Amino acid sequence: MCERAARLCRAGAHRLLREPPQQGRALGGLLRWVGARMGEPRESLAPAAPADPGPASPRGGTAVILDIFRRADKNDDGKLSLEEFQLFFADGVLNEKELEDLFHTIDSDNTNHVDTKELCDYFVDHMGDYEDVLASLETLNHSVLKAMGYTKKVYEGGSNVDQFVTRFLLKETANQIQSLLSSVESAVEAIEEQTSQLRQNHIKPSHSAAQTWCGSPTPASAPNHKLMAMEQGKTLPSATEDAKEEGLEAQISRLAELIGRLESKALWFDLQQRLSDEDGTNMHLQLVRQEMAVCPEQLSEFLDSLRQYLRGTTGVRNCFHITAVRLSDGFTFVIYEFWETEEAWKRHLQSPLCKAFRHVKVDTLSQPEALSRILVPAAWCTVGRD
C-alpha cells in the first residue's frame, strides 16, 4: 500500500516536470499577442488631417461680374487697361482721378491692368447682400432661357389650352420681372437724386440759362427737339416731329449752322451780333461731343440703341438740344448734346438711359469713343428779337 502510493507520487511528479506551468503558457500567449500587434501598422495618435476639400466653389454673382469684364474688355485681350476701365465705369460721380485710384486699388499685383480674378475678387469682397441678388440673376437667366425653349415647343405642337396657359404664364412672368425692375429703378433714381444734391452742396449753381434763350422762365416741361444735321449727304432719321413754331424753327436753323461750323473746323464769333439777353452775356452752354466708330457687324444693334438714346435724352429737361450725325464712311457717328450746366450733364450720365446706351457702345464700338466738351455762348441759342 505504501509502495503503491509512492509510485503514484513519483508518476505525478514526473508529469508535472514534463508539462509547462500554466503561468508560463499564459505569459507566452501574451508575448505572442504583443509581438503580433507590434508587427501590424499602427494609427497615429495625432488627430487626422482634414480631407482636401478641393477647389472652392465660385461665389454667387461671379458670372455677372465676368460678363461685366467681357463687355468692358473692348479689345478682348483678357485684361482691362485704365482707359477701358474709365470708359466703362464712369458714372458722372467719380472724377477721372478717383476712377484712376480705384483702378490701381483693384490692380492688386501692380501690373497696370486689371484681370478677371482681380475684378471678381474686388467686387465679391464688396457685394454684401447683392451676392444673393446677382446669384439669383444667374439662376433666373438660365431659367428664362429654358422657359423660352419650352414656350417655343408648346407653340409648335401644343393644344390651344396649352398655348393659353403658356401665354398666361409668360405674361405673368414679364409682369413680375417688370415689377421688380421698377422697384430697383426707383431705388436707382433716389440714389442718383441724393448724389446730385450732395454734389450741388459743394458747387454753387449757376443762374438758369433758359431765360437767356427764351426771355422768360422755363416752363414746367420745356420741349426739346432733335436736329439731324446733314453732313456729306448722310443723315440719321429724326425721332421727333418737326418744329412748327417760327421761333423754334429759327433756333433749329441757327443750331444747324453752328454744327456745320463745328464739323468744318470753322467756328467763329459774329462780332456784330446783337445779344438778346441784357445781363447774361456771360452765360454758356455745355456742348458735349461724342465720336464713335461702330463695328460693321454691330451696326444694326447700335442704331437701335442710338435712336432710343436720342428719344430719351430729348425729353430730359436740362438738355436744350441733341443731334446725331453719320459720317461718310457709314460707321462713324458724332453726337452733340447741349446742356444747361455741367452738373446737368453729369446727372444725365447716371441715368439708366445713359448707362444702357454706354453698355451697348462697349459691345458695338470698334474702339473707345472720343469725348470732348466745350462751353459755347448761350446767346447762340437765343431767338433774335431785333
From Swiss-Prot:
Q: Which gene encodes it?
A: NECAB2
Q: Which residues carry this modification: Asymmetric dimethylarginine?
A: R42
Chain sites annotated for binding Ca(2+) 1: D73, N75, D77, K79, E84
| SMART domains documented for this protein | EFh
Residues annotated for Ca(2+) 2 binding in this entry: D107, D109, T111, H113, E118
Coiled-coil residue spans: 170-201
Where in the sequence is Omega-N-methylarginine found? Answer: R10
Source species, domain of life: Eukaryota
Protein name per its UniProtKB record: N-terminal EF-hand calcium-binding protein 2
Q: Which GO terms describe its molecular function?
A: A2A adenosine receptor binding; calcium ion binding; identical protein binding; type 5 metabotropic glutamate receptor binding
- What InterPro entries does the record point to? ABM_dom, Dimeric_a/b-barrel, EF-hand-dom_pair, EF_Hand_1_Ca_BS, EF_hand_dom, NECAB1/2/3
Compartments annotated for it: namely: Cytoplasm; Cell projection, Dendrite; Cell projection, Axon; Cell membrane
**Pfam families with a match to the protein in the record:** ABM (PF03992), EF-hand_7 (PF13499)
Keyword tags: Calcium, Cell membrane, Cell projection, Coiled coil, Cytoplasm, Membrane, Metal-binding, Methylation, Repeat
User: How does it associate, per the subunit comment?
Assistant: Interacts (calcium-dependent) with ADORA2A and GRM5.
- Stated role: May act as a signaling scaffold protein that senses intracellular calcium. Can modulate ligand-induced internalization of ADORA2A and coupling efficiency of mGluR5/GRM5; for both receptors may regulate signaling activity such as promoting MAPK1/3 (ERK1/2) activation.
List residues of the ABM domain: 286-375
GO terms for CC? axon; cytoplasm; dendrite; plasma membrane; postsynapse; presynapse
- What phylogenetic lineage does the species belong to? Eukaryota, Metazoa, Chordata, Craniata, Vertebrata
**Organism of origin:** Homo sapiens (Human)
Any one of the GO BP annotations = regulation of amyloid precursor protein biosynthetic process
Its tissue distribution reads: Expressed in brain. Expressed in the spinal dorsal horn with especially strong expression in lamina IIi; found in excitory synaptic boutons and in ependymal cells (at protein level).
* Gene3D superfamilies listed in its UniProt record: 3.30.70.100, EF-hand (1.10.238.10)
**Domain EF-hand, residue spans:** 60-95, 96-129
Q: Where are the transmembrane segments?
A: none
Q: Which CDD domains match?
A: EFh
